[in-house]
């Protein structure tokens, strides 16, 4: 059951949670971690800029509120490839909302947790696998370690962002951030394959999971030979490697680079701390440089509490959770009733290529190709 009025967590606490997420004083992420492409626990205390103006004054989100969902009751073992700094507050909110709900979270990289579940076999305690990209979800499903999600969960999200075995809970778009003192948007190529001939200074983060997923998409669309030629081309042109994509975006804003390849939210985080920074977002069109990837969740096939696992995943698609992803992590919500934060195109307005994002699970061949070209991964 939920807490009653005397317990102090009612509709008013839901409003406080949403206000805390949407207000200009909300925590701002200013850094990122390594290989899975997940931002890290580095809050910014700088003034709120472009994104802050988008966060302030947002109306109540649409979608299904948690009050209309089944209560969460019982013990849930969550294996999370998402950083605790990003999702810990949301999980704590659900924990506080339901007094009979006890979540236990094991954090780690998504790929490591896939291997852990596989190694644990039928004795795995994991109920839910929650991770930062579709590749990890696809890998677990391909190993036969997931179970079919409820029809309600599947119908909540557009079919391109889920299968019957896993569902996306938030999304991110690949972009080309550029320095506005050096280039105008019209001068940035809209074809990702044109960048080996780009005259400006480029940057990327090839050890980063999102960058490797982008390169995997190029292998799928263009073939291995063309991808090898592209990789060799940008390396020969002097592309500068960075440890993560926030550093790429920051270097562009600082004038150290002219353009680069990152997820959309890194530009927004730079602008959130420095609203006048000379950085803007450009998009390529319908190619590997324009893929849209998702964080998402699956119920493990041997889940000790599969019904609770299904209900928990449904809560990740609630109005409150989707608003949280929009205003706290600057991701794209995946239910149509909640809009992204800031001056961003909607998911429907993005010119993304049509393909099965679960194919991004085959990253090993991409890493081998990048290393063969001489790129450190």
Q: Across the structure, where does each feature detected by a protein language model lie?
A:
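Conserved C-terminal helix/tail region of periplasmic/extracytoplasmic solute-binding proteins
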Residues: 359-377
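Mature extracytoplasmic/periplasmic domains
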Residues: 295-357
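N-terminal Sec signal peptide cleavage junction
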Residues: 31-32
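N-terminal secretory signal peptides
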Residues: 1-12
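Early extracytoplasmic/lumenal segment of secretory-pathway proteins
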Residues: 51-138
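A ligand-binding cleft/hinge motif common to bilobed small-molecule-binding domains
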Residues: 135-139, 259-278
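Periplasmic-binding protein-like
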Residues: 159, 172, 231-234, 241-242, ...
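Extracytoplasmic ligand-binding site segments that recognize negatively charged/polar headgroups
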Residues: 81, 85-88, 111, 124-257
């Amino acid at each position: 059951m939920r807490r009653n009025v005397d317990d102090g967590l009612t509709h008013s606490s839901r409003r406080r949670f949403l206000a805390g997420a949407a207000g200009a004083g909300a925590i701002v992420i200013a850094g990122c971690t390594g290989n899975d492409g997940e931002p890290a626990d580095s809050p910014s205390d700088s003034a709120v800029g472009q994104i802050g103006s988008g966060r302030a004054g947002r109306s109540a989100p649409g979608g299904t509120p948690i009050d209309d969902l089944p209560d969460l009751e019982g013990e849930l073992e969550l294996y999370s490839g998402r950083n605790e700094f990003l999702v810990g507050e949301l999980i704590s909110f659900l924990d506080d909302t339901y007094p009979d709900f006890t979540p236990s979270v094991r954090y780690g990289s998504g790929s490591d947790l896939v291997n852990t579940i596989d190694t644990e076999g039928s004795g795995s305690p994991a109920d839910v696998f929650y991770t930062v990209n579709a590749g990890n979800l696809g890998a677990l499903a391909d190993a036969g370690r997931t179970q079919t999600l409820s029809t309600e969960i599947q119908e909540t999200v557009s079919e391109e962002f889920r299968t019957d075995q896993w569902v996306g809970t938030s999304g991110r778009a690949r972009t080309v951030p550029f320095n506005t003192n050096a280039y105008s948007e019209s001068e940035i190529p809209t074809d990702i394959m044109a960048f080996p001939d780009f005259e400006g200074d480029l940057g990327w983060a090839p050890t980063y999971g999102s960058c490797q997923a982008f390169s995997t998409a190029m292998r799928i669309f263009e073939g291995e030979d063309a991808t090898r030629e592209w990789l060799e081309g940008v390396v020969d042109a002097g592309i500068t490697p960075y440890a993560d994509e926030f550093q790429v975006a920051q270097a562009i804003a600082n004038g150290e680079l002219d353009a680069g390849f990152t997820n959309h939210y890194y530009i927004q985080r730079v602008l959130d701390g420095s609203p006048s920074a000379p950085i803007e977002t450009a998009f390529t069109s319908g190619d590997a440089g324009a893929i849209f990837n998702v964080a998402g969740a699956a119920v493990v096939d041997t889940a000790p509490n599969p019904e609770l696992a299904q209900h928990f995943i449904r809560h990740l698609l609630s109005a409150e959770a989707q608003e949280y992803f929009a205003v706290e992590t600057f991701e794209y919500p995946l239910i149509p009733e909640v809009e992204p934060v800031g001056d961003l195109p909607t998911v429907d307005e993005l010119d993304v290529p049509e393909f099965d994002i679960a194919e991004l699970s085959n990253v090993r061949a991409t890493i081998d190709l990048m290393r063969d070209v001489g790129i450190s991964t």
